[in-house]
């Protein structure tokens, strides 16, 4: 079986899909919301599960069943339209929904900041308002038209202020302010009883007001009689005594002609009828009051006869003053003189109005009374006086306000929600005239006003359709030119510039990815394949469905309803509402809950939308793509397997059979060369029934087939190792005891998982890279990790220990002497000697005094390390193992470990080690020590009482006394127990098997001082020990610590786990990509001292495992340094192993500060060290003075000046590192400090102070990942040694993950504690352990402890001054003599002394320093060094050893990004974070391409333009220089250059699109940044990796706009797309290596059997 791999996927691109693309993915349109038919359970046609669209539900069978079977594959059934294929298609084939109205994609609308908002330049809130058909709350004045003049307005029609302002610009008409009526009281009732009078009048807006007057009246009645002549008219005013009717003389009536008389008594009239022969007509006379006829009825009369008598009518006088009112019965007739004559008796009243009310009613009111009607108080006059929301002018309003006070309210301004629209098209002239432009948002009232004035020259719309029009109208090229032009005018740091740059970036991204902006508005929605959103039948016949189906259903329902509404020509408002609902439905399908309230199911649980399927821990990325399940695996409890070799494990038979089933089956079939189905069945049965032959085959297969064992939590790579399985009975996996430390396993019920590597390549990797015998050395620190412990150590110690009298026994007194080791063995076997008896043995021609136990142990040790006079405890065994590994390699070491294990277990058993309480001897010294301490404490108390000590000092002294006493008791106890070397407790502690001196002290000495809950030490110690027992008080004091310990452990585990996740995330892509990046930079090797002066790391540890960046010169000879023992030369690229590190770390020589010398100018040679002129000379009038540095230029000038010799002063110490502190003899000022690189100024200061010589070491520059210049990852040389095998690291090694694991794995051992150093407020709390590590990795701005001060210069502490307020100031004099002042905050203490020398970055006070401050004031190297020291210190304090290079990788990632200050001519924005190497590369490319500008200008002539050219001309106008497809001429080129166009995109002869730069570009200006690890992992190059970390939708949105390509450089990205990671054997350079599994030949198989 051969296996190779090729990388299938080179990159993954994400883009915005166009409607055409969405439809091209689809196999059909989903038109119905139905899913499955409830009767047949078959998918509904055109529904969400339609077989025609998505493929058949049964394999190779159409829906109607006409075609069945694979032979019809590809046939489309003509009955049901289903294509015959595998049901797998239902996981692949997509559908789509064609939307009736466009819908905005919520990701682009609601990203933060919103992409559509930035692109269109419309604020996000307003944009959302447009999309969701929102309104705008407007308060505006009301105006009413009073004179329309020549317009189409009607008198009385109302306008709002905004409309009026628009109309009045073009039209002439008059308006007055108006009000709107609110809550008028109804109905109108009369407040008095009285008579009704009704009248009508018109207002100035031609609207009618009806007046109802009600009057309450007092009346004087006067009777009037026929014939009376009235002096007054109805309504006239009279005074009392006025004559209404004057006295009048009535003459008799005479007959006018001959005739007959008729008297009518009822009407009081007399009629004369003429004779029938006469032509006269009858005449009637009314008889006035008091006139009587003188003739009888029917009498005949002659002309002139008297008919009546004459009389006098009396005068009628007004009895009261008042108003005249004619009674209803009064009948009058007007006369020519204007007076009235009474025709019939009646009544006249003189009225006085007692009370009168007027009720104006607006047109439209319903009146319930009639004119003249008498009504009572409370009667209803009309249903209302005004309508709700009636508009009135101010004058009209005043009438009603006067007559109906407090019966209604009126508003002169109205607050309304006006629907808004966005302008999508506007004529240029209209735009200039109105000041509006495309994209402006106005209310629909304003829009219709503009439409009236300008017609179709202006168009506006709302909803997604409007956004789509706006996006379609965008000319991106023009927009780009406009933004670039505007950017030149604003300051780069302003907020406006940032907005413009964001917009410019989006425009450029859209152009680059060839995305049309309108694609962000959806016309069609893809429907995911049905098997990804299944519907399953649950018991009870109900169906359970994925949330997506519900969300799709809502979209289809609303879409179909909208379609119907369009067909029915529904009103605009209903259609708008339906469009809004469709938009919301699509929003919740894409990202439920992003806009407004989330759609929930009946239990109130939000439905999971497409976005929810991607993001978060449970999303597609982290759940399925990065967290896959593993096939061929099992897990079981582990038990110890002491008989195993280190590379073996015991695998339970049953488990092995299950895991290797396919292999066993294949082998069984292979044996008999059978392939038939029945044969398979038979062989399967053999396996299932567990017949012996199955196990025989299994035994054979398992040989040489490694398995992987893994124990969770997998904190580092040693938690997953390969073993060769051995079949065992039982159900538990057997584990070799020596691999317990790397797995952190014990046998108290731990479980482990087993995995089977399948392919030949995987097996090879497991066998050669992961086998446990190759993982003895830890990659964290390069020392062994698979180490014997517990009983093995105790056994080996017991074997090699001696009696206490061993050393004092003289050789002549030794009873047993042997000629050989074998002979001693015989004596032991026969019982003559015991293991620990002193014996003399001849070994290698020498007689040595030893014990038989030591002889046994020496037999397994390599020859070079045999030692017959050594007791082997844990430390000695560790050294032995490490030395064996260094000398003989990993295989011999593994064998040695197995031998140690076997011996250890055997002799631990023989030793019969037991523990009893009586084994804890209590030292007689103990009481004395305690008594002395008590006496000292009493003294202190007395001094305190007398006032010689402060409370703080007393506390500190007491603590100190008891701490010393405890230590003395500890030593005394150990010494006392050790008097009997066979004391089991002493054996356990001294060997390092279990327990330590501290625990022994507590058991048999005294428990000592305890801490209280805050961590402050309690000054009363526990004097008792556990053997004697504690008093109640002592027991109580000791509980604090125990509780705190338990709480800490629980908190630590989770914090450490999260720290590891962040570390891995930030460093995962750091892989060794090349053997050598070629850099000459490096870091200076130095002793690491933390800010408080603690030595964190010795020089030899700093050097171990690194590669030299420069040659190391011997300070004495100035030649390359040579190791005298090994003869190794320390030149560039030498890898420093353990022995080299020890040599270089301890090598130093004493050399003179200055020597005199001279240069022979006849054959000049410059000295190796720095030198200066010791005499003056002049050449060409230039004076070369004493003290000038001598270089070749000076030598040449001296030769030309005719000198033969040149006297010089040589300073050999310059460039060397001092290993001592040199003080001035005058004022004991520090001239040079330990580990200081001596510079010229320092050397001269030494010379001035008459210092003759200094002890120095060479300056050693080593390669470091911090200075590596590899484009991606790091190079082998900068990384140095792979600590797990002590070889230079291989290309492909995943050093980032190893670093993260090495730092994260011991995280749980770091304490959480924040110690008090004893003081309450005076000394700072020191944050330690995990919180401090996190504080540093996260580069916290806010530190838990007070901030310290550091020096920014190299110099001396001149003075330390304290002012009255207690503030201290430190003055530092630099080497140039300038003074620098540093103020020390009150909360911290000064950490330097007067005369002390300080170096840049050195702490001047206690307290922590912010790394960012160091970066700002010093440089990157100082920051990296500070971080390294401080992080390393956290681990060193807890006794955890981790190599610097691991921390350096994390620090490199934290310092890897730079912040763009000025993007120059690149697409970055100010504030963008970019990798340093990327910026350097881009700047280099810009500078290189700037050189080619002239040649490009020639090349571009005659080529065809791919884009039209647009730029801003001198007048600030955007102009088009050339059209797309036009040929570039000299003229066009000249114009383009003049207007500042820097790139031309053209088509060359073959039609390829090429970009030519025609103007020089500006490079990026940047500043270095220190990022916290969380931020550093988010700031990734690839979008896949970033999307899978946090903020998935945001990352994908931005990536799609950009058309981002992920080149799959990191590890996570490749895991996501499912191919090998580019690390280790997954690197491209190993891609074509063929791994063959050679078949074993028959003879070989027989041998093995």
Swiss-Prot record:
<keyword id="KW-0240">DNA-directed RNA polymerase</keyword>
<dbReference type="InterPro" id="IPR038120">
    <property type="entry name" value="Rpb1_funnel_sf"/>
</dbReference>
<dbReference type="InterPro" id="IPR000722">
    <property type="entry name" value="RNA_pol_asu"/>
</dbReference>
<dbReference type="InterPro" id="IPR042102">
    <property type="entry name" value="RNA_pol_Rpb1_3_sf"/>
</dbReference>
<comment type="function">
    <text>DNA-dependent RNA polymerase catalyzes the transcription of DNA into RNA using the four ribonucleoside triphosphates as substrates.</text>
</comment>
<comment type="similarity">
    <text>Belongs to the RNA polymerase beta' chain family.</text>
</comment>
<keyword id="KW-0460">Magnesium</keyword>
<dbReference type="InterPro" id="IPR007083">
    <property type="entry name" value="RNA_pol_Rpb1_4"/>
</dbReference>
<keyword id="KW-0808">Transferase</keyword>
<dbReference type="InterPro" id="IPR006592">
    <property type="entry name" value="RNA_pol_N"/>
</dbReference>
<dbReference type="Pfam" id="PF04997">
    <property type="entry name" value="RNA_pol_Rpb1_1"/>
</dbReference>
<feature type="binding site">
    <location>
        <position position="62"/>
    </location>
    <ligand>
        <name>Zn(2+) 1</name>
    </ligand>
</feature>
<keyword id="KW-0804">Transcription</keyword>
<protein>
    <recommendedName>
        <fullName>DNA-directed RNA polymerase subunit beta'</fullName>
        <ecNumber>2.7.7.6</ecNumber>
    </recommendedName>
</protein>
<feature type="binding site">
    <location>
        <position position="80"/>
    </location>
    <ligand>
        <name>Zn(2+) 1</name>
    </ligand>
</feature>
<keyword id="KW-0862">Zinc</keyword>
<dbReference type="InterPro" id="IPR007080">
    <property type="entry name" value="RNA_pol_Rpb1_1"/>
</dbReference>
<dbReference type="Pfam" id="PF04998">
    <property type="entry name" value="RNA_pol_Rpb1_5"/>
</dbReference>
<feature type="binding site">
    <location>
        <position position="1278"/>
    </location>
    <ligand>
        <name>Zn(2+) 2</name>
    </ligand>
</feature>
<feature type="binding site">
    <location>
        <position position="77"/>
    </location>
    <ligand>
        <name>Zn(2+) 1</name>
    </ligand>
</feature>
<feature type="binding site">
    <location>
        <position position="1275"/>
    </location>
    <ligand>
        <name>Zn(2+) 2</name>
    </ligand>
</feature>
<dbReference type="Pfam" id="PF00623">
    <property type="entry name" value="RNA_pol_Rpb1_2"/>
</dbReference>
<dbReference type="InterPro" id="IPR044893">
    <property type="entry name" value="RNA_pol_Rpb1_clamp_domain"/>
</dbReference>
<dbReference type="InterPro" id="IPR007066">
    <property type="entry name" value="RNA_pol_Rpb1_3"/>
</dbReference>
<feature type="binding site">
    <location>
        <position position="746"/>
    </location>
    <ligand>
        <name>Mg(2+)</name>
    </ligand>
</feature>
<dbReference type="InterPro" id="IPR012754">
    <property type="entry name" value="DNA-dir_RpoC_beta_prime_bact"/>
</dbReference>
<dbReference type="GO" id="GO:0000287">
    <property type="term" value="F:magnesium ion binding"/>
</dbReference>
<keyword id="KW-0479">Metal-binding</keyword>
<feature type="binding site">
    <location>
        <position position="1268"/>
    </location>
    <ligand>
        <name>Zn(2+) 2</name>
    </ligand>
</feature>
<dbReference type="Pfam" id="PF04983">
    <property type="entry name" value="RNA_pol_Rpb1_3"/>
</dbReference>
<dbReference type="Pfam" id="PF05000">
    <property type="entry name" value="RNA_pol_Rpb1_4"/>
</dbReference>
<dbReference type="GO" id="GO:0008270">
    <property type="term" value="F:zinc ion binding"/>
</dbReference>
<feature type="binding site">
    <location>
        <position position="748"/>
    </location>
    <ligand>
        <name>Mg(2+)</name>
    </ligand>
</feature>
<dbReference type="GO" id="GO:0003677">
    <property type="term" value="F:DNA binding"/>
</dbReference>
<dbReference type="InterPro" id="IPR045867">
    <property type="entry name" value="DNA-dir_RpoC_beta_prime"/>
</dbReference>
<dbReference type="GO" id="GO:0000428">
    <property type="term" value="C:DNA-directed RNA polymerase complex"/>
</dbReference>
<feature type="binding site">
    <location>
        <position position="64"/>
    </location>
    <ligand>
        <name>Zn(2+) 1</name>
    </ligand>
</feature>
<dbReference type="GO" id="GO:0003899">
    <property type="term" value="F:DNA-directed RNA polymerase activity"/>
</dbReference>
<comment type="subunit">
    <text>The RNAP catalytic core consists of 2 alpha, 1 beta, 1 beta' and 1 omega subunit. When a sigma factor is associated with the core the holoenzyme is formed, which can initiate transcription.</text>
</comment>
<dbReference type="InterPro" id="IPR007081">
    <property type="entry name" value="RNA_pol_Rpb1_5"/>
</dbReference>
<feature type="binding site">
    <location>
        <position position="1077"/>
    </location>
    <ligand>
        <name>Zn(2+) 2</name>
    </ligand>
</feature>
<feature type="binding site">
    <location>
        <position position="750"/>
    </location>
    <ligand>
        <name>Mg(2+)</name>
    </ligand>
</feature>
């Amino acid at each position: 079986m051969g296996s190779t791999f090729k990388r299938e996927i080179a990159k993954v691109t994400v883009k915005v899909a166009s409607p055409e693309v969405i439809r091209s993915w689809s196999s059909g349109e989903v038109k119905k919301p139905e899913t499955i038919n409830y009767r047949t359970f078959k998918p509904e046609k055109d529904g969400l599960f339609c077989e025609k669209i998505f493929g058949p539900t049964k394999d190779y069978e159409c829906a109607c069943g006409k075609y069945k079977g694979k032979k019809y594959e590809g046939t489309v059934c003509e009955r049901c339209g289903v294509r015959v294929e595998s049901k797998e298609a239902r996981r692949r084939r997509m559908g789509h929904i064609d939307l009736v109205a466009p819908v905005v994609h919520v990701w682009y609308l609601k990203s933060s900041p919103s992409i559509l908002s930035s692109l269109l330049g419309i604020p996000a809130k307003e944009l959302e308002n447009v999309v969701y058909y929102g309104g705008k709350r407007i308060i505006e004045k009301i105006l009413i038209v009073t004179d329309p003049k020549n317009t189409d307005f009607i008198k009385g029609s109302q306008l709002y202020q905004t409309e009026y302002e628009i109309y009045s610009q073009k039209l002439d008409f008059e308006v007055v302010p108006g009000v709107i009526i609110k809550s008028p009281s109804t109905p109108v009732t009369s407040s008095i009883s009285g008579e009704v009078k009704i009248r009508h009048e018109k207002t100035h807006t031609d609207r009618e007001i009806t007046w109802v007057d009600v009057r309450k009246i007092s009346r004087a009645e006067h009777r009037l009689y026929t014939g009376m002549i009235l002096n007054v008219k109805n309504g006239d005013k009279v005074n009392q005594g006025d004559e209404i009717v004057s006295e009048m003389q009535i003459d008799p009536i005479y007959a006018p002609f001959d005739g007959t008389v008729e008297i009518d008594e009822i009407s009081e009239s007399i009629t004369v009828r003429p004779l029938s022969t006469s032509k006269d007509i009858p005449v009637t006379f009314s008889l006035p009051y008091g006139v009587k006829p003188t003739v009888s009825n029917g009498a005949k009369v002659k002309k002139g006869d008297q008919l009546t008598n004459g009389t006098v009518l009396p005068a009628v006088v007004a009895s009261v003053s008042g108003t005249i009112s004619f009674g209803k019965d009064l009948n009058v007739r007007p006369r020519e003189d204007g007076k009235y004559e009474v025709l019939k008796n009646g009544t006249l009243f003189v009225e006085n109005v007692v009370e009168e009310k007027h009720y104006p009613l607006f047109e439209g009111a319903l009146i319930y009374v009639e004119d003249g009607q008498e009504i009572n108080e409370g009667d209803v006059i009309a249903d209302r006086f005004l309508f709700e929301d009636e508009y009135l002018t101010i004058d009209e309003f005043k009438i009603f306000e006067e007559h109906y006070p407090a019966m209604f309210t009126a508003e002169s301004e109205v607050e309304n929600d006006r629907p808004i629209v966005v302008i999508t098209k506007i004529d240029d002239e209209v735009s200039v005239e109105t000041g509006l432009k495309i994209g402006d948002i106005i209310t629909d009232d304003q829009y219709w006003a503009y439409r009236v004035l300008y017609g179709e020259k202006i168009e506006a719309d709302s909803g997604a359709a409007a956004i789509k029009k706006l996006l379609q109208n965008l000319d991106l090229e023009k927009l780009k030119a406009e933004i670039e032009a505007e950017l030149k005018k604003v300051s780069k740091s302003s907020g406006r510039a940032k907005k413009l740059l964001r917009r410019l970036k989006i425009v450029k991204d859209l152009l680059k990815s060839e995305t049309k902006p309108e694609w962000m508005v959806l016309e069609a929605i893809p429907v995911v394949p049905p098997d990804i959103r299944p519907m399953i039948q649950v018991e009870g016949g109900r169906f359970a469905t994925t949330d997506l189906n519900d969300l799709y259903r809502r979209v289809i329902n609303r879409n179909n309803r909208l379609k119907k509404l369009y067909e029915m020509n529904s009103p605009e408002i209903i259609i708008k509402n339906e469009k809004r609902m469709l938009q919301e439905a699509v929003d919740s399908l894409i990202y439920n809950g992003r806009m407004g309230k989330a759609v929930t199911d009946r239990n109130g649980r939000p439905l999971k939308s497409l976005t929810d399927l991607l993001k978060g821990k449970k999303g597609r990325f982290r759940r399925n793509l990065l967290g896959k399940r593993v096939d061929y695996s099992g897990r079981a409890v582990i038990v110890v397997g002491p008989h195993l070799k280190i590379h073996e494990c015991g695998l339970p038979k049953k488990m092995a059979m299950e895991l290797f089933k396919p292999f066993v089956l294949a082998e069984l079939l292979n044996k008999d060369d059978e392939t038939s189905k029945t044969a398979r069945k038979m062989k399967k049965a053999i396996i299932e029934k567990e017949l012996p032959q199955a196990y025989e085959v299994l035994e054979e297969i398992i040989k040489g087939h490694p398995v992987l064992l893994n124990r969770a939590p997998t904190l580092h790579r040693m938690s997953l190792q390969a073993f060769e399985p051995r079949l065992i009975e039982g159900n538990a996996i057997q584990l070799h005891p020596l691999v317990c430390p790397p797995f952190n396993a014990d046998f108290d019920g731990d479980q482990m998982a087993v995995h089977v590597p399948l392919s030949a390549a995987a097996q090879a990797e497991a066998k050669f890279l992961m086998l446990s015998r190759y993982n003895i050395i830890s990659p964290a620190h390069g020392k062994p990790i698979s180490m014997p412990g517990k009983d093995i150590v105790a056994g080996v110690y017991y074997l090699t220990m001696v009696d206490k009298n061993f050393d004092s026994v003289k050789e002549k007194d030794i009873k047993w002497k042997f000629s050989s080791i074998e002979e001693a063995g015989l004596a032991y076997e026969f019982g003559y000697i015991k293991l620990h008896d002193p014996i003399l043995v001849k070994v290698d021609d020498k007689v040595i005094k030893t014990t038989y136990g030591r002889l046994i142990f020496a037999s397994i040790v390599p020859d070079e390390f045999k030692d017959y006079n050594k007791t082997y405890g844990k430390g000695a065994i560790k050294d032995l193992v490490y030395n064996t590994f260094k000398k003989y390699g990993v295989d011999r070491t593994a064998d040695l470990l197995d031998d140690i294990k076997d011996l250890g277990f055997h002799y631990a058993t023989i030793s019969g080690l037991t523990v009893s309480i009586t084994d804890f001897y209590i030292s007689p010294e103990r009481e004395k020590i305690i008594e002395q301490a008590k006496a000292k404490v009493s003294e202190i108390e007395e001094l305190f009482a007398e006032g010689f000590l402060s409370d703080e000092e007393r506390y500190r002294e007491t603590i100190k006394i008891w701490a010393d006493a405890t230590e003395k008791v500890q030593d005394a106890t150990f010494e006392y127990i050790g008097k009997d070397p066979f004391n089991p407790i002493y054996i356990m502690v001294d060997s390092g098997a279990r327990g330590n001196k501290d625990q022994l002290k507590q058991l048999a000495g005294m428990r000592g001082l305890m801490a209280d809950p805050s961590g402050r030490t309690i000054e009363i110690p526990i004097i008792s020990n556990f053997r004697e027992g504690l008093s109640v008080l002592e027991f109580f004091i000791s509980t604090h610590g125990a509780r705190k310990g338990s709480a800490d452990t629980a908190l630590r585990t989770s914090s450490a786990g999260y720290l590891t996740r962040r570390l891995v995330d930030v460093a995962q892509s750091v892989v060794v990509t090349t053997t050598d990046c070629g850099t000459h930079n490096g870091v200076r090797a130095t002793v690491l001292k933390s800010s408080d002066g603690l030595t964190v790391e010795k020089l030899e540890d700093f050097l171990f495992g690194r590669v030299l960046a420069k040659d190391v010169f011997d300070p004495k000879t100035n030649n390359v340094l040579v190791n005298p023992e090994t003869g190794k030369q320390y030149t560039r690229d030498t890898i420093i192993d353990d022995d080299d590190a020890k040599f270089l770390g301890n090598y130093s020589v004493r050399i003179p500060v200055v020597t005199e010398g001279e240069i022979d100018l006849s054959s000049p040679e410059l000295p190796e060290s720095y030198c200066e002129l010791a005499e003056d000379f002049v050449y060409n009038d230039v004076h070369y003075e004493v003290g000038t540095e001598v270089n070749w230029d000076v030598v040449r000038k001296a030769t030309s000046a005719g000198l033969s010799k040149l006297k010089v002063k040589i300073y050999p110490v310059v460039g060397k590192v001092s290993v001592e502190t040199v003080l001035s003899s005058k004022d004991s000022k520090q001239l040079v400090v330990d580990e200081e690189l001596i510079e010229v100024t320092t050397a001269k200061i030494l010379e001035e102070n008459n210092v003759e010589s200094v002890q120095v070491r060479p300056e050693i520059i080593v390669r470091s990942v911090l200075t590596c210049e590899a484009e991606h990852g790091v190079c082998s040389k900068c990384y140095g040694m792979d600590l797990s095998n002590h070889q230079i690291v291989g290309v492909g090694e995943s050093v980032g993950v190893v670093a993260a694991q090495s730092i994260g794995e011991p995280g749980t051992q770091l304490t959480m504690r924040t110690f008090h150093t004893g003081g309450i407020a005076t000394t700072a709390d020191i944050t330690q352990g995990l919180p401090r590590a996190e504080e540093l990795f996260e580069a916290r701005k806010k530190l838990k402890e007070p901030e310290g001060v550091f020096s920014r210069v190299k110099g001396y502490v001149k003075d330390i001054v304290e002012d009255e307020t207690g503030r201290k100031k430190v003055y530092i004099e630099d080497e140039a003599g300038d003074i620098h002042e540093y103020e020390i905050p009150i909360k911290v203490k000064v950490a330097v002394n007067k005369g002390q020398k300080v170096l840049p970055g050195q702490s001047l006070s206690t307290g922590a320093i912010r790394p960012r401050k160091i970066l700002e004031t010093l440089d990157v190297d100082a920051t990296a060094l500070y971080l390294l020291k401080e992080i390393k210190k956290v681990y060193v304090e807890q006794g955890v050893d981790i190599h610097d290079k691991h921390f350096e990788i994390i620090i490199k990632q934290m310092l890897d990004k730079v912040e763009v200050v000025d993007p120059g001519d690149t697409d970055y924005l100010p504030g963008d974070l970019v990798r340093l190497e990327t910026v350097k590369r881009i700047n280099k490319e810009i500078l290189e391409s700037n050189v080619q500008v002239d040649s490009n200008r020639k090349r571009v002539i005659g080529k065809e333009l791919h884009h039209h050219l647009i730029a801003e001309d001198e007048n600030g106008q955007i102009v088009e220089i050339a059209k797309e497809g036009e040929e570039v001429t000299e003229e066009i080129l000249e114009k383009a250059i003049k207007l500042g166009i820097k790139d031309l995109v053209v088509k060359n002869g073959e039609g390829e699109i090429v970009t030519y730069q025609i103007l020089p570009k500006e490079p990026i200006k940047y500043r270095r940044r220190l990022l916290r690890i969380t931020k550093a992992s988010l700031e990734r190059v690839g979008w896949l990796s970033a999307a899978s970390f946090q903020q998935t939708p945001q990352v994908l949105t931005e990536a799609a706009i950009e058309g981002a390509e992920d080149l799959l450089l990191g590890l996570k990205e490749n895991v996501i797309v499912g191919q090998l990671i580019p690390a280790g054997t997954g690197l491209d350079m190993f891609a074509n290596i063929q791994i063959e599994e050679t078949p074993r030949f028959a003879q070989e198989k027989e041998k093995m059997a």
